[in-house]
Structure formats: C-alpha cells, structure tokens
C-alpha cells in the first residue's frame, strides 16, 4: 500500500506543496516526480478529457514516487463515478467542485468512504488495480486516509 504523503503532512499539521496538471500523460507525472519539489500532483480532470485507462496509467506513474501523492479534481456531473474510479486507479485524494450545500458535501464523503458501518460510505471493495495484493482491512484504511477536499465556490455552499 502506497503511503499518502499529503494525508501524512496534513495529519502532522505541516504545510503542503502541490502542482496542477491538465493532462493525464504519465510522462508529466515522471518529470514532476523526479523534480522532488512537490508533495502531491493534482490532475484537473474537471477541465480535460481522459479515459479510465489513462487514469490507471496516471496512478501507475504516481507509484514510482513514494514521496509524492496524487489528487483528482472532479467536476459535479458524474462525480461519484469519477471519484471512485480515480481512487481505484491509484489516485489517492479527491477534490470535489461545485458543492452547493452541506448535503452535497456529505454525499461526496459517502462516495469515498468504504461501505462499512464505521465509515458510513458507499464505496464497495474494489477489484481493480489499486486493491490487488491488499486485503479488505488495508483497503478500508486507504479509503479512510483519502483526503477529501471540497472547493467552496458557489453562493449556496457559502451560505449553507
């Protein structure tokens, strides 16, 4: 199980430094990873085209760098599907956009957290690449360690 450096730094109360990319090309991940300058790389899926295969290759490239985590910026439409498939591909953290209410935020959290009584989520155990070689306990820990970021950008989100 790959360590989630972003989660570790946040848990320690330390600052983080990330960068954004608008392409899922693994070569970009490798260039950024070899720089050693960033704690995480955020793929801005909200504004670019990608396939599920490209997400998996992005996740594979991230695994080359134990000191760098990853994040997927997810748009409003289809966010549950995109977020869970990103995690299952190996992207460790998720940034949700366009939340308009506290209920929207709670829904985003449910998408990520495992479907256990303790976690209260709806994300079932994955039989995809990220969980291969992991057991259910490790997988639940991965989902609990996922940083769930919420972009507050809509008037309703500020008011609610």
Task: Outline where the language-model segments fall.
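Expand to "…catalyze enediolate/carbanion chemistry for C-C bond making/breaking, isomerization
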Residues: 1-160
